[in-house]
A protein has these predicted regions:
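Glycine-rich SAM-binding Motif I of class I
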Residues: 70-74
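A short acidic, Gly/Pro-enriched loop at the edge of an enzyme's catalytic core
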Residues: 126-134
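Conserved class I S-adenosyl-L-methionine
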Residues: 59-68
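C-terminal lobe and adjacent flexible extensions of AdoMet/dcAdoMet transferase-like proteins
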Residues: 242-285
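A short glycine-rich, Lys/Arg-flanked "PGG" loop and its adjoining helix->strand segment in the class I
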Residues: 150-162
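SAM-dependent methyltransferase
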Residues: 168-238
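Class I SAM-dependent methyltransferase SAM/SAH-binding core
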Residues: 76-123
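Class I SAM-dependent methyltransferase Rossmann-like catalytic core
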Residues: 11-53
Length: 285
């Protein structure tokens, strides 16, 4: 598949990741450790009965959304290939640099071409393909408020096969941030010899439920990125998945974190039903 640019990417997200708060180079020690952990996790996940039927297929098509450099997608493909399954992997994200890195690295690891498409994850239905698995790996849900998440789920469910599976790698941020730790108005994000990155509370959007955070590098204070995040709990995420999938399960990895599984898309609410913005969002917050 050719590399395609589909409009709708969030420029702020690209600017946020450009601050290098979270390492994305798949060759880095951090990413390699994540990759090994993902391979181990997906290896155990194959014991789930929903994947037993999948393992009997001759070919499995995987779509990774919010893929970055494709750590999760490549790990899942590797696990399936080691079990004798022929795999096609497509990475999607709005960050083209990371996709290019991930495509090259993933092709080396798997010994076959890994394709990518630069696009907004809420529009993956426009790919016009059907996949067996849709994967969202790496705690990406805070980039989507509830209004966006509804569209994301609708779009993903339309590009999955009738027996398709959604895998979301998630944690309960309401529990971990607001109960265990406490919401921080000022939070050191990454401090090392090259940068001193802080995030600061910058507001709250009541209509979307999002917290505004300003990200600032004290060593380069001329550029500040202000973005909005939604701190999801697991319960509401799983309930939303249930609206779009016939069954939902949770594969717990540790307390308050694990893999949300959606099985067999319902396709009762179509992405076309959600194209018009509701009136409540048309006015200023």
């Amino acid at each position: 598949m050719a590399v395609v640019l589909i409009l709708g990417g969030n420029k702020l997200i690209e600017e946020l990741y450009a601050l290098n708060i979270w390492p994305t180079d798949p060759h880095s020690e951090f990413s390699q450790r994540r990759f090994r952990e993902a391979v181990e996790v997906f290896g155990r996940l194959m014991e789930h009965d929903w994947f037993q039927e999948l393992l009997r297929k001759e070919k499995v098509r995987i779509l990774e959304i919010c893929a970055g450099a494709g750590i999760g997608g490549v790990a899942l493909a590797k696990v399936l290939m080691e079990r004798g399954v022929d795999v096609e992997l497509l990475l999607t994200d709005i960050r083209e640099n990371d996709l290019e890195l991930g495509s090259r690295w993933g092709s080396e690891v798997l010994g076959r071409k890994v394709d990518y498409v630069r696009m907004d994850s809420r529009r993956v239905h426009e790919l016009g393909c059907r996949f067996d698995i849709a994967l969202m790996y790496g705690f990406s849900s805070p980039h989507f408020d509830p209004w966006d998440m509804v569209r994301l789920q609708a779009s993903v469910s339309e590009c999955l096969a009738d027996d398709g599976i959604l895998i979301m790698d998630e944690g309960d941020r309401r529990y971990s941030i607001f109960y265990q730790t406490g919401y921080a108005r000022i939070l050191p994000e990454r401090i090392d010899n090259e940068r001193a990155l802080l995030s600061l509370h910058a507001g709250y959007n009541f209509k979307r439920g999002t917290f505004k955070r300003a990200y600032l590098d004290l060593k380069n204070p001329s550029k500040t990125v202000i973005t909005e995040v939604y701190f999801w709990g697991l319960a509401e995420l799983m309930a939303m998945v249930w609206i779009f999938f016939q069954d939902v399960d949770f594969y717990e990895l540790r307390r308050g974190a694990g893999l949300i599984l959606g099985y067999k898309p319902r396709r009762k609410i179509r992405i076309g039903d959600l194209q018009t913005q509701p009136r409540v969002l048309l006015s200023q917050p």
